[in-house]
Amino acid sequence: MTDSTTGIALLPGIDGTGIFFEPLIHVLPEDIPLSVITYPPNSILSLEEHARFVAEYLPTEDVIVVAESFSGLVGLELLHLRLPAIKGVIFSAAFAEPLHRILIRGLSLIPGIGSMVKELPVPVLDHFLFGNFSNKDLANLLERGLPKIDAKCLKHRAEIIASGYPRLDEHFDIPCLYLKAARDRLVPHTAASWFAAHFNHFACVEFDAPHCLLQTVPAECAAEIMGFYNVLRDRNPSGIKNEE
């Protein structure tokens, strides 16, 4: 049984649309208050502005934040605000340290690079993002999601990724669950170690899946999310072990 007063807020990956949460939403319990954050299109936001945008749309009741990939940085910035409603955080294939700095900054010099990425053939992106987990539903999700992505925002968020979280020495006392992708080709396997070292209550669960965990193994991720949810519902953060 869930506690309907505690909600879950989903923060999207670099696309910013929220549409790619569909596979996860379909397997989460229907009675949980769920908020899907969509970053504003045509708005170039700094990392801090992303976090403050999210803060405005978070439920006023207790909430657990699920931050996917790029939004791991937003989630950290959000935690820096010390909002009392946030009772726990789940990072999916996230990172804190600067990522692919040379590659991203080199590509950013190419005019129209954001639009080029959007225009890549769906089968190419499907294979790169989902690998052997690819199926018709995920391909269809890409076909529907790509037109919704703002190319300029995509490029700017990539630049934020290249910069990383600006307060790498910061520590957090809030309970944290890290969902790790064993087949991740975008985020290094060592990324979880930063979170293990900077969260006092930390757990890590690894899946034999690619970077897009919430799309390729949604049921397995939902089970871990709900396990974490139930621990916090019972107000027992000490039950979250440091396993990394």
Predicted regions located by residue number:
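Acidic catalytic loop of the alpha/beta-hydrolase fold
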Residues: 183-187, 212
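Catalytic histidine-centered segment of alpha/beta-hydrolase-like enzymes
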Residues: 45-46, 209-222
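Short alpha-helix in the alpha/beta-hydrolase fold that links the catalytic acid
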Residues: 23, 174, 188-197
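Flexible "cap/lid" loop of the alpha/beta hydrolase fold
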Residues: 47, 80, 85-117
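Short beta-strand/loop motif that positions the catalytic acidic residue
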Residues: 172, 178-180, 184
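Conserved alpha/beta-hydrolase catalytic His-Asp/Glu region
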Residues: 119-170
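Conserved HGGG/HGGXW glycine-rich cap/lid loop of the alpha/beta-hydrolase fold
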Residues: 2-44
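Gly/Ala-rich beta-loop-alpha elbow adjacent to hydrolase catalytic centers
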Residues: 67-75
